[in-house]
């Protein structure tokens, strides 16, 4: 029979939540979901019927995952002091908490970026350009642009546009005007709702993200409403003028947007500091909606007469 102290120690260990290793948290794999935009051109250009195009798209997706992680590490290096002062989630980031030193983080980035650029070169020169621009944009955002109102939103949105353009040049197809405008509008919606959630989930939000002192919940609501309407208008025009068969995806898209906004409304009530992406990857309904949208799109476009 164990002494009471030992039993208490074992109970404490069993009740302690499992913690993801610091290296994995540093890379933020949950955020790789955003790189699904890289696969958009593969679907809408009907290039998924080509094995070569599929392989190039998957390579582009993986490279962007690596580049995105490098960008997050750069951001965490610059934000380590403010992250340490954060009242909740950010203070536990590996660099801010001291689990991974700045020196080690710099070494990781210094090795990863040249390797990723080399891999991008083997996909295509244009794809290398897309990756390089994304890296520069990410660095500029971390250093300065995230403190500039409005510009910060468009910088976030531009990152999504570069993902889509990268996916297009990786398989040597032209990025359509409709896809460009729809992606930009959708990304602005995501950026505005993200800022809105930050304003609601932190009592002194502007102390930890300076740009928030220039925003209000009402303003973010206004921006997100404009962006989501623009997204539906441009997506609808694309369907009507180019791919009428994709009308079958509209109910799924509507559900996805409604569900996303619903999830964003939950965070302030529950007092959590989850990012929007964290919520999406943990929500079964959003996962099913995304899979359903992709499946319907592929089936409809595959059955479309050549």
Model-derived features with residue positions:
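Short, aromatic-rich membrane-interface segments at the entry and exit
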Residues: 52-57, 125-131, 149-153, 174-180, ...
